[in-house]
């Protein structure tokens, strides 16, 4: 995609998900790219756990501000009530805004305030990423999680899978009682029982 014809004709560098090389190419005259708002994805992942652990309204720090002032605007996320799912919304990265995306591991400004440990004490979380070799997950998503876990007072054990077998992950869930919460990223979406059977022990 990075060729002279694309550059001369302003063709967006789709498929690169606002990775560093795609954003840098915009400065060289390429048309742009798309960001799936990994910073918001990572925040939502851990924020939902934090809210559940604190026993507060699920939208705290999302649709409504928390005590530290963290809040998301409706143009960066969407909640599907039927699916009970939160989604980060894609955003176009262009010559006008690409400088905002030069660091793909920077927490999203409106939700980058430290929580008070007296009201949100440290909790232990087990979180797996189904494929540690995936460039987006390992180079963007996990580094963002690692920054947010500090802000949200969460002590997270990150487990990287091989992207092929569920057992590569489940074999490292030996002592569930050591954790207060779990975030599970399955290799195959029909393998939930492999995890719930371990958590029920």
Regions found by a protein language model. Give the residues of each.
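Short, solvent-exposed loop/turn elements at domain surfaces
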Residues: 23-24, 98-104, 133-139
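Short helices/loops that flank or line small-molecule/ion binding pockets
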Residues: 24-29, 167-178, 197
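Short beta-strand elements at the ligand-binding edges of bilobed clamshell
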Residues: 27-39, 43
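Short, Asp-centered acidic motifs that coordinate Mg2+ and/or phosphate
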Residues: 32, 180-181
């Amino acid at each position: 995609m990075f060729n002279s014809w694309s550059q001369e004709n302003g063709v967006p560098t789709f498929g690169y998900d606002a990775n560093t090389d795609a954003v840098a190419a915009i400065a060289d005259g390429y048309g742009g790219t798309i960001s799936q708002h990994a910073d918001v994805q990572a925040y939502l992942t851990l924020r939902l756990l934090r809210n559940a652990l604190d026993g507060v309204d699920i939208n705290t720090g999302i649709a409504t501000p928390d005590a530290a002032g963290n809040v998301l605007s409706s143009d960066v996320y969407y909640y599907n009530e039927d699916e009970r799912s939160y989604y980060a919304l894609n955003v176009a990265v262009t010559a006008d805004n690409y400088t905002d995306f030069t660091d793909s591991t920077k927490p999203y400004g409106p939700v980058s305030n430290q929580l008070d440990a007296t009201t949100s004490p440290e909790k232990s979380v087990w979180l797996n990423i189904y494929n540690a070799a995936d460039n987006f997950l390992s180079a963007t998503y996990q580094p963002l999680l690692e920054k947010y876990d500090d802000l949200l007072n969460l002590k997270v054990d990150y487990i990287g899978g091989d992207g092929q077998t569920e057992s590569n992950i489940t074999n490292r869930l030996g002592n569930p009682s050591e954790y207060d919460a779990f975030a599970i990223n399955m290799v195959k979406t029909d393998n939930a029982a492999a995890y719930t059977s371990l958590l029920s022990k």
